[in-house]
Amino acid sequence: KLSQLDERFENLKKIQNVFLNCFYNEPKTNQLYKEITLNKKTDFSRYNYFYASYTNSSGKINEAKNIVQSALKLYPRNLLLNQYKIDLKEEKKINAFDCRKESHVIAEILYITANALSQESIYSLSNFYLNLAKYLNEDFHSFNTLMAENFYKIDNLEKAKKIYKSLGKRGEAYNWYSAKQTARILIQEKKKNKAIKLVRNTYNDLNNKNIYQTYDFAEFLKNNEKFDESINYYTQIINNVNKKHPLYSEVTDGRGIAYERIGKWSEAEKDLLASLKANPNQAYVINYLAYSWIEQGVKIKRSLEMLEKANQLRSNDPYIIDSLGWALFKLKRYKEAKGYLQMAVRLMPGDPIVNDHFGDVLWKNGNEVQARY
């Protein structure tokens, strides 16, 4: 019995309890769904979908919409919830999961097992359980997101692309997700232009764009060196959120990097500082700004203080360690710099910039012969 199992299975007991009560149509089902979705210790975001689906199937569509809307405030990127929001709005008669159907409940338990196996990198066995889950509930297309990711992890890219293509036909949110994942594969296959075209066209076709989709599109453009275009989308978001919005620090960081890459440093600096003002403990933003100052030969002492903080936040990150060592080098504290730059080389031996920095500090410390190699 589950009650006799280790404490680690407490969450599974909660899931079992909800599904058992729903299966037997017990009056407390609604309350149990509320309790599990309000749990702050564990990510039960998926169960907001099950709760909304249960409520909708009971004829309470407006209540189901409210459940989804409230959940999306906490989990704005949740794929299941985003797609179900669209389905409810369009009044699609879809009941991909019904906790009163034994096969659906068993399929979900098999999915939980598959997900756990995937997290342990046991991808083939994970897909075995996913296939069983899909057999028991062929309408629950969310299973395919994990299966495609498993195939991607074992480098079966064609199979992953095929699943994403099929998944993309199941709704607008699924289509956007599938386009991004397919683009990742296309870039890996050296088909960057095709990837950009796919994501751009899919984004433009979205009827229900939200700021998170716009942010993802801006990030995709920036990461693929479409800096000017990305700035336009970052700016759209900044104009529509306040400084306390969770995305604000990320958007100003992204736009700041894009500005820096096209040579507009004053705009970049302003955005990066705004990002840190909104969220001061972003190690990588601290590193990006401080390293940029160091490269320009300005604010070296301030950069050092910032990088020491970044190093405390991310003590084993080679990029931050390299930046910290380089700041010490610029301040002519060569012996201290050597220790950090040597550590950075050990963590990232193939990086040419890190190796150049280490070579420079070796030279300054009198290790001319070693520096040559």
Functional labels for PLM-detected ranges:
Residues 4, 38, 73, 134-135, ...:
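Conserved structural position within tetratricopeptide repeats
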Residues 19, 53, 87, 115, ...:
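Residue-level recognition of tetratricopeptide repeat
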Residues 23-26, 58, 120, 154, ...:
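Structural motif corresponding to the intra-repeat A-B loop/turn of tetratricopeptide repeats
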Residues 6-16, 40-50, 61-63, 74-82, ...:
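Generic helix N-cap/helix-start motif at coil->alpha-helix transitions
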Residues 6-7, 56-80, 86-89, 168-170, ...:
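TPR/TPR-like (Sel1-like) alpha-helical repeat modules
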Residues 25-27, 61, 123, 157, ...:
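TPR-repeat structural position
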